[in-house]
Amino acid sequence: MSELPIELKGIIASLKAPDELWLTGATIEEEFGEITEMTVEFVTKGPIVLGDVVGQAMSVSMEGEGGFRHFGGICTSIERVGEKVMEDSVDVGYVAEIRPWLWMLTRASNNRIFQDKDVVEIIEEVFGDHGFVDYTKKLNASYEKRLYCVQFGETDYAFISRLMEEEGIYHFWNNAVNAGELSKLILCDNKSSSHVDTPGMSTIKFTGSGGAGINLDHSVTDWTSAENVIPGKVTLNDYDMLTPTVSHQVVTETVVDTAHSHATYELYQYPANYRKDTARGNRMAEVLMEAQETEYKVRHGATTSRNLAIGHKFTLEEAPEGEDGDYLVIAATHYIRPSISQRQDHNQLIRDRRNLQYPEEMEGMDYQCRFKAISTDIQYRSKCKTPWPSMTGIHSAHVVGPSGEEIYTDEHGRIKVQFPWDRVGQNDENSTCWIRVATPWSGKDWGMVAIPRIDQEVIIQFENGNPDRPVVTGMLWNEDTKPAFPYPDKPTELGIRTNSSKGGGGYNELMFDDLKDEELMRVQAQKDHQFLIKNKSVVTIGLDEIDAGAHDEDGSLSEVIRNHVTRTIKEGDHYFTMEEGNEEYTIDQGTQTIEIEGDKTETIRTGNHVHTVQTGNMETTVETGNHETTVDTGNMTTTVSTGNHETTVSTGNHTLDVSLGKSETEAMQSIEFKVGSNSIKIDQMGVTIKGMMIKIEGTMTAEMKSMMTTVKGDAMTTVKGGITMIN
């Protein structure tokens, strides 16, 4: 077996001359979707300063077929593990842990919100925040914009890992021959366009453990194949408030022709993370199914070829049991140590930890690669193994919106908030997505509605603990928004008080005071009040139980009041209209007084107006002004069954005008008209006219006729005419 050089590079090499620093061993573990873990052992002549090494770039290089391979990264940990004291020097042993730059994302965590970005844009933003640009995208799929995506309480690496696992993106580090001194991160999502043949080794033969005359440098020495039971389909479902009655279920069945009879098993997941976007749901189900299919048939092998590289394809020939075919390396562990001729005896180091462990069959070898591969017919996907953060408990936030607004909502009564942990949001309408607001009662065009207003503090909880699905479940008082009632002085007061918008300064209120013996219910309308009762209303005041009164029919208002009723209109008019029906006032005991400073007009368009005084008097007094009764059509009848009917005009005139028809006055005893000492009296005995002067004038004729007529003048009697006839 040929001996090819292996070098340890980096800041350590610059600290010591080549003859004062030598590599004693290294292991490198890499796998799709994982961070490469590299452990290096080395010895120096004399101690080094650990602080000069940690955090610096380091790499192990080895020569392969056609060029060099470089495994490198950042020294994340270094440990002094032992020493060998000699007469004139000290050999010191060290173990360094080396990780690629992606590992640095495990050292950073954040709470932040991404909006209207796809998964690739989010990943690139996270990389860019740390200044990392050494990656290549070999992506074939199109990724939908995520309206709202939250990182909370998780490292940057965990955050992007769970997103990639969900979307079917995986990554590896390209450290193949001639790939460059710095391993580059490759982002993949497709078996056809993301992977190429292994440089310098597109075809490799299976030789077994070898034999005389067999060159093991370019062969597979171990090969095993395993098959596993996988489910036959993946079913996902989700819910979206915009389509609440629509099923969003998607199903993806395996494309693998399984040899077992258990393909009827199903993986069911709810909620999946696609809302009503079933196209995205189908892709997610496909990714989950492909992750299962990746594990259906896997191969494990070993080779001493230094060219075999993760993320690359090779063709296996002369394999056992018909295993010839094209394969993709999805994981590899590299064991490296100096060639026998380059090794020095450091077993005499006084060590505080054991040496790196190598496979037993590596004895006498300087390199071996143990790898895991799948057929290139299978689309690799990583399993969703990175946990999502679970948003347990409650969170608080403040309602936000555009500048100058007090209430900001959409047609569904949703709001936007600013979380106190969000360092990016600007406390405006762009801080979050629209967030649903829980209510004690909701229905189609009915329920309880109270939109949280800007600057109010709200309680946020999350659907199934999903950080991407917040819901407002309540509200909280704080120092800036104190309770509406005077606590703690009046702890018995409770109720609802609103705030006039915009600008405040007024409110509507429904207040209750439960103070014993002083209980109170107060209602305030800041401006207008509308009250609609579609059947009947019963109001009882001053009693312990409801009393419907005399009328309890549908469409009725019944008011029973034990004591007084006072209505005062300080300014304006009082209109009372009965479109149909009767009005009845009954005062069983007591009096009624109506006092009007101006006019009173009563108009009865059709029907009768009846005033009945059963016992007592009826008196109408107009101190100043007029009293006018008008009947447009019909009759006016005044009836006094027992008692008197008296009309008194203290100052002014009394006029009776019958334009058409007649005026008739009838009395049982007498009718008398008086002016001063003059009178006309009509009684049962006759008609008596008395006056200081009586004039009877007939324009054409005047006739006085009776059975007996007496004309008498105590002083003088004059009978005068053009012709006077006395018979």
Where in this protein do the model-derived segments appear?
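Structural signature for extended repeat/solenoid scaffolds and their inter-repeat hinge/linker regions
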Residues: I169, W173, N178, K184-N190, ...
